Amino acid sequence: MFQDNPLLAQLKQQLHSKTPRVEGVVKGTDKGFGFLEADGQKSYFIPPPHMKKVMHGDRITATLHTEKDREIVEPETLIEPFLTRFVGRIHKKDDRLSITPDHPLLKEAIPCRAARDVTDDFQEGDWAVAEMRRHPLKGDRGFHAELTQYITTGDDPLVPWWVTLSRHNLERSAPEVETTERHDGELVREDLTALNFVTIDSASTEDMDDALYVQDNGDGSLQLTIAIADPTAYVDAGSELDNIARQRAFTNYLPGFNIPMLPRALSDDICSLRPNERRPVLACRVTIAADGALGDDIHFFAASIESKAKLAYDNVSDWLENQGEWQPQNEEIAEQIRLLHRLCLARSEWRTTHALVFKDRPDYRFLLGEKGEVLDIVVEHRRIANRIVEESMIAANVCAAIVLRDKLGFGIYNVHNGFDPASIEQAVAVLDTHGVQADAQTLLTLDGFCTLRRELDAQPTQFLDSRIRRFQSFAEVSTTPGPHFGLGLEAYATWTSPIRKYGDMVNHRLLKAVITGQAAEKPQDDVTVQLAERRRLNRMAERDVGDWLYARYLKDKAGTDIRFNAEIIDVTRGGLRVRLLDNGAVVFIPSSFIHAVRDELVCSQEMGTLSVKGEVVYRQGDTLDVIIAEVRLETRGIVAKPAA
């Protein structure tokens, strides 16, 4: 009788349209229930039966109901699933497979089967890549995934590397393309093999891509020649290898090993500026005035050089600081080091006055055993030899930025616009609260930004600096010239690492066009998109492998009295994120470890402070001693608490 009844259909439609709905992101918990975090900062309870239809991170719409005076939501439609492609561990029971995603809030195993073209015999504990195929909110009975790639066994010591690379869909090995033929075309090379060029790198570096030579002009000024390895002499634009390099965009440096952008034969041998080997280079010659200013005589040219010494950062630094056993092999090399040191001090002083100099932060290097175990973590402070190379490279990149801008009007530029205009008023308000007067329009100029940064660097603590950084925009890659506020420079275009950066290869080709007087095409914007995306993925991969190795390294320190000095890098709703200064690990201190009474404690991300009973106890940038409370290897989570 009620079948196909138009009145009933109309009533259903009215009820449907009157039912209130909310859109938001599902947040899972360990307890079976969940919450829907709506875009307006409000969250709604999702009871356990309804949580079975969704997954943590899903963006959904849900209907809103009231049950026992409490608002609850019932998931209705899926807008965007949290899981599409993911990595996880296999479970096998009675020949049926399921996979648990490698995510701290996804504990449920998802039924799965191997894709038709995947022939691996999956076993319990194996790691695999999977793609979601079914979802309850799409009308399916349950979740279901398809295994698209086998990664490795559960007990492989190199799990952190292989799983991370698979998670981010990054290559696991060097390109396998043979190329040894050189194509110089109309490029004429100057013979500079008699000059005392030197390379300065880490002792273990094989892909040396920059060599330096300095000459004293006798009037207080110096003439610097920067010679850069020339892979574009072997890699033609549009060739198979060029397309591979463009796709990879960068050499991927992970703890323990790297995955090169170019074949190792090129990166570590044919192009590498090895000592006493003749190599083709792209070079730049420029005068550095006594006060460190760059001359207007910038000259780019092609050349052949022969590096006379492969120097290591620590050896050069020790020698300049009059310590250690190491000595340069002869007086010519010693003179080069002295001149480079003089150049470094002049350029550093000029940049401190007229541009901006980054504060030195140490690097942390993992020392790994044969099976990927962490033997130690070494703190590598930036020393004078690192600064020599840094100042020379920055000078070289400013030269390229000027020449490409003036001759072509385009290139691959690193651009940073300082403050985000949308946040500038907030930045001014925060500065005002801390007694620093600033004008919004002035802060949006390069000079205004530099003046503020110098003022912040002179502050006794990092607190205000860390508050203000939240309002800055991100650095970008652009095909048109623009300022780099972070460096305090009018323009910046890198060309000094073409073995490991595709953008630098593009700039090499453009500089060669300037040298030979040939026409050059403006790079496509999709190149900059790929560079930005790959930089993001490579950084995430480095962080993920690091998190895994830190968890392994600190596992046996959990529950002991070993103290670590730590710096607060962030205040979150639930506690503090701190960096252990001895080894670089980022760990979490839950607020309950700081003060037991939740209502008396306020964690303010906005203010960067943690207060107890209204008194500020910790601020971002503060240091404190901590001990490791717990290490969860399966999620790579490290929990610490303040040392008593």
From Swiss-Prot:
Residues 561-643 form the S1 motif domain. Its EC number is 3.1.13.1. The keyword Hydrolase applies. Keywords: Cytoplasm, Exonuclease, Hydrolase, Nuclease, RNA-binding. GO terms for molecular function: exoribonuclease II activity; RNA binding. SUPFAM superfamilies: Nucleic acid-binding proteins. One of its GO terms (cellular component) is cytosol. This is Exoribonuclease 2.
